[in-house]
Amino acid sequence: MIIEIITIFPKFFDSFFEHSIIKRAIKKNKIIFQVHDLRNYSNNKHNQVDDSPYGGGAGMLLKFPPFYECLKKIKKSFSKVILLSPQGTLLNQKMAFEYVNEIKHLIILNGNYEGIDARILNYIDAEISIGDYILTGGEIATIVLIDVLVRLLPGVINSESYLEDSHQKDLLKYPQYTKPKIYQNQKVPEILLSGNHKNIKDWRYNQSLKNTFFKRPDILKKINLTEKQQKILLEIKKKLKEG
């Protein structure tokens, strides 16, 4: 997968590429990054890429021409161009999987200040948001998106690691424990020490559903619950009523 980033802060990504899973993916040639400094496409001696908005208003907007010129140079017929924006579709795990499986060349545009001249919208394929809040720039959101995508690339991490993640199966993850068995009088659930893999699997399944019920009930409203899941939820609700 090739990811190209258009930004006014190209050095923002330097340390990100040098750590953890991202660095490993680069070394394994699973991902190639290219970062483009928007100022190199300003076509003016001061490298200015922003200006005040027509019609008045606070702040500055990033200009349309630099983005257009950069896209003209790097975009391929098979590229997908996205803009990180609070107005975009909320990023989720399903979307991330689709991107990894379907996209070979991704171009990410980063807005700053009050955003980008709206004419850029005619040259993108999608707007993506990482949440209903405002950041100082798109670069942080880009890092989030890249991290989500890279860990799903085949061969970057063990597939079992992400197949058990929260949201991977429309539910939150079950609680996990490690050594010691007892600390501050808090014990690891006995079932996890039993060695009975079927019972452990069933316990984790139930706990995953329970976690989702208590922490993110909105998720359960969006999925078609199986008969087994409905039965487990009824038991949870029954125990709540009984105190």
Swiss-Prot record:
InterPro entries hit by this protein: Alpha/beta_knot_MTases, tRNA_m1G_MeTrfase_C_sf, tRNA_m1G_MeTrfase_TrmD, tRNA_m1G_MTases_N, tRNA_MeTrfase_TRMD/TRM10
Keyword tRNA processing applies: yes
CDD domains from the UniProt entry: TrmD-like
Biological-process GO terms, alphabetical: tRNA N1-guanine methylation
Keyword S-adenosyl-L-methionine: yes
GO annotation, cellular component aspect: cytosol
Quaternary state and interactors: Homodimer.
HAMAP family documented for this protein: TrmD
Purpose: Specifically methylates guanosine-37 in various tRNAs.
Protein name: tRNA (guanine-N(1)-)-methyltransferase
